[in-house]
Swiss-Prot record:
Higher taxonomy: Eukaryota, Metazoa, Chordata, Craniata, Vertebrata
Induction field: Estrogen receptor alpha (ESR1) regulates CSE promoter activity and induces protein expression in human osteoblasts.
Protein name: Cystathionine gamma-lyase
Record family assignment: Belongs to the trans-sulfuration enzymes family.
Disease: Cystathioninuria: Autosomal recessive phenotype characterized by abnormal accumulation of plasma cystathionine, leading to increased urinary excretion.
Binding residues for substrate: R62, Y114, R119, E339
Activity versus pH, per record: Optimum pH is 8.2 with L,L-cystathionine.
Function: Catalyzes the last step in the trans-sulfuration pathway from L-methionine to L-cysteine in a pyridoxal-5'-phosphate (PLP)-dependent manner, which consists on cleaving the L,L-cystathionine molecule into L-cysteine, ammonia and 2-oxobutanoate. Part of the L-cysteine derived from the trans-sulfuration pathway is utilized for biosynthesis of the ubiquitous antioxidant glutathione.
EC class (word): lyase
GO molecular function, a single term: identical protein binding
Cofactor: pyridoxal 5'-phosphate
Source organism superkingdom: Eukaryota
Amino acid sequence: MQEKDASSQGFLPHFQHFATQAIHVGQDPEQWTSRAVVPPISLSTTFKQGAPGQHSGFEYSRSGNPTRNCLEKAVAALDGAKYCLAFASGLAATVTITHLLKAGDQIICMDDVYGGTNRYFRQVASEFGLKISFVDCSKIKLLEAAITPETKLVWIETPTNPTQKVIDIEGCAHIVHKHGDIILVVDNTFMSPYFQRPLALGADISMYSATKYMNGHSDVVMGLVSVNCESLHNRLRFLQNSLGAVPSPIDCYLCNRGLKTLHVRMEKHFKNGMAVAQFLESNPWVEKVIYPGLPSHPQHELVKRQCTGCTGMVTFYIKGTLQHAEIFLKNLKLFTLAESLGGFESLAELPAIMTHASVLKNDRDVLGISDTLIRLSVGLEDEEDLLEDLDQALKAAHPPSGSHS
């Protein structure tokens, strides 16, 4: 169920009880003998058994941990899912999901994805006999044309990283499931479950680099996977234990804490992201702004149909050359030049040289990841300070004629 939000600006209404669930699901003090209101960090690697083979829910911390259990329950609720599994990183989650397949199976991956996902599929998974096809899944007909009898998994991001194409999740799910037993995975890192719930739109798996918005404080590396299908959950739980790429209890504690302010943070990210996008769109030294929340985005109407809002991810092309982009980035004072995204602090980066350097240059050219494409992760600072910083950096990159740099 969803509740109405007068400030939704034409987007879907926010998911009902989101804040309450983020604060309370999986956190019941009654589960601890101490009645701790905040779930404690359970660092023990092993747990006492009452008799051989008789345990109270936990045996060995790789297989299950009380702190991780609290986090997984909370995320499942926020994703509108029955189950959630936590992993050591987003890529650890990706690797585990890929282990659902066998040699000879085909993966169809959105052509515009996180550079680490592209690298793993292209340079690692393909070496183990998996067939990888990169397709522009924003065009449903191209996706359907790429499906073969060997297709077992379709992997999409929406919005994509970094060019922010938006994919019709419901449309993809209809096509994918029409062709048989194919798993549809949506990397929901850019949106978080606060703004988008892929499972409700027909996806089989909703996954995250929890390093980003879910944790939100740039101090945890983690991955999360949410599912509704019991058999799929059982297979993934087996692989989670067998492959062993699980997060530490401390990281689980921190991410669980981050969830408590997710709803508040995402609203501020949306507000600041929109302000930055509008400012850049009106700036004469900006060639083009890509932000799904702007009416100028080619898939803005689709965004409003499947999302409750947008985040702080803003992509734009600065006018000029690589030199102009570098001068802009070097002159930023509030935005930090760094990779990653989704933290409380504002970041800026040059994907062609940083996060997407592992993507083949020809592919970058086709995707539009040029030397003048800049990706911003707009944080929670005061709006006027963010705009002032962008303004002075743009002026440094494009000084008025007659001035000296």
